[in-house]
Amino acid sequence: ARYVLIESVQREALVRFARNDLNLAIKTDKNLETIFRNSMETYNIEKLHNLKPSIINNLNLNAFIYNIKYYIKGYGKLNSSVYIEKLNKDLFTSKSSSKLAFYHEDIKKLSLETKENIELLNHNFNNLADILESKGIKLIFMPAVDKYNLYRPYIISNNYIESIFFEYLSTLDKKYIFINTKEILSKNLENSEKDIFYADDTHWSYKASNNIIESDAFNNIFNKGEQ
């Protein structure tokens, strides 16, 4: 079987795919096999482990200034890009093991999470799945859960909006395969696994990648052809 896997960070998924003008046309002037072959990327878990995490620039380059602001202001919005909140358990191996730093867009983009937008995204992927199915290709959609959304249940004082993206999307009828990364990684946090995300980064760590690849939800697709 052949598959196309589309991955998008959660906060950008609706911006990219919940559109009435989304162009699903597959060009006929290029060989489809060539297009997919040229766009393939191979991920090596060991190499991912050795990569240094990209640091949130404002938090890193202006550490002295922001630390002063942080101690004066306390938890909440640290600056224009970063929020800091206290967790009810240690989920990182850093010095601040129970502090969550997350990107402001994780909060800002929650305003797009309406049922109508999620239904439109699902509709577009169903249409794309039909197109690919006619060519003998199965579609997989794997949205990468935002850091705030994943760690939200553990924030002690939380006045922010709650995400409905994964919860509502999982209830809709699909012609494509949906990998629920929030569901997979939430189980890791329930077991108090640390550093699923890097403490000072917006992206998940090699541990998250490894856990997803080794999950039943992921392996059932390729080993058993199940969704």
Give, region by region, the residue ranges found by the protein language model.
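Extracellular glycan-modifying ectodomains
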Residues: A1-Q227
